[in-house]
Amino acid sequence: MQVSVSLYLNMFGFDDPVLNDIVMRIVHDRSIVCLITLDKSQAGGVHERTLLASDAAKDPEGYRTHFVIGESATHQISHTKGFVADGLVGAEGSTNWSASGEGTFVVKGEPGGAGYKAQNNTQTFFTCPDAVARFQAELLAEHVAAQVGRAKS
């Protein structure tokens, strides 16, 4: 599915350069509504910080407009991991957008080998209009909470 209308995304771990490039293409398309919420503690990690600094340097306006790095409304980690694309499909689960979250295949197509990393994660995709709308509203609320928290600090 190619996003053409909107992307609402909340991610705890966000250090996958390939997925980041896809997100940044969406950020650069001014016809797509795009809100990205990332956890403050996780975004401060070495890989995340480097990736996000590169995004901010390449497109400061796009980065400031679409990304919020913060915490939950209760001042805890923002641990939701999911998105809604075009108001049609949602996904939520425990998978971080990171090498260990997605699983790193050392041998093409086969798990295992020296350096293999993979967390035990789940990801559910859904298209029920009511579930998609409710999850999109939750992602928007989390984005606003992170913005408000950032403005206070």
Predicted regions and their residues:
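HKD-type phospholipase D/PLD-like phosphodiesterase module
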Residues: M1-Q2, D16-M24, H28-S153
